[in-house]
C-alpha cells in the first residue's frame, strides 16, 4: 500500500463529477487500499477518490466501527429529519463549518467484490457518507 497526496481545495478535480467505476479490478482495489491507508494516516474519518486526484466514484470511511468501502454509491432515501453539526475536510485543512445533513440515509453501493450492498447509516455515520458523496459531484 502507499500513502497518496491529498489535494487541496481549488484543484479542478474536486470540482468535477467523478466517473462511475466500470469494473472492480486489481487497480480499483489498490486505489481503495491506498485511500484507506491515506485516510488513517491523516486521522480522517472519510476520503473520496477525487481528493487523491482520482476522478472515480470511490469512497473509504470509518466512524470508529471499521472500514467501509463504497464503489459507485447512490443515495436512495434521505430522512426529512436533519441536524446541523460541524464538519472538517482533509482537502481544506484547519477549516471547520456547520453543515445541515439528513439524519438518516439509505445508500446502494458495490463492494470490492462487485456485490451490491445497502447501507442505512444514521447520525455521525450518515454525515460522513453524505460529506464524502458530495466530493463525487464536485
Where does each model-flagged region fall?
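Positively charged
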Residues: 1-138
